[in-house]
């Protein structure tokens, strides 16, 4: 009997197990199917996004963003983007190009950006780690966004 138990345990140890990434992918697919979360593949990024004093607009192939910490400390940039699945390839000009994550309702910039992006900021401000949530899917609202100095970012 002991030999049978040992053989059964060894055989069970050889059976394939689900990889951790598989489980999270399955959970995400189930949430999308039930409408709990938005399907990023079926969602256009066009619209207006915000979080505290940060704003981002997407209208057509144009993208603009700003952060405003007050006391003339902030960042402001505008440029173009292309979409590649759940990634937005953003080009704000003069070598400031990077990839941001898009999940259908949120846009998140990487924690490290090219040094050339620093020109978009004053004093110690940075766009690194910039993260915003969707407020509107309206292209016209996005096109109307202006930075704190009155510059139109997506129009």
Predicted regions and their residues:
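Sec-dependent bacterial lipoprotein signal peptides
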Residues: 1-12
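N-terminal helix-cap/turn-to-beta initiation motif at the start of protein domains
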Residues: 32-50, 57-59, 148-153
């Amino acid at each position: 009997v002991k030999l049978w138990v040992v053989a059964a345990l060894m055989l069970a140890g050889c059976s394939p197990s689900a990889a951790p990434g598989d489980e999270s992918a399955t959970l995400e697919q189930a949430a999308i199917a039930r409408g709990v979360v938005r399907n990023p593949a079926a969602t256009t990024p066009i619209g207006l996004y915000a979080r505290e004093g940060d704003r981002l607009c997407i209208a057509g192939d144009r993208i603009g963003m700003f952060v405003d910490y007050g006391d003339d400390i902030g960042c402001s940039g505008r440029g173009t983007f292309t979409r590649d699945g759940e990634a937005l390839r953003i080009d704000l000009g003069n070598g400031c190009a990077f990839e941001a994550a898009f999940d259908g309702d949120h846009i998140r910039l990487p924690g490290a950006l090219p040094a050339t992006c620093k020109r978009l900021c004053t004093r110690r401000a940075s766009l690194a780690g910039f993260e915003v949530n969707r407020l509107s899917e309206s292209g016209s609202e996005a096109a109307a966004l202006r930075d704190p100095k009155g510059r139109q970012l997506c129009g």
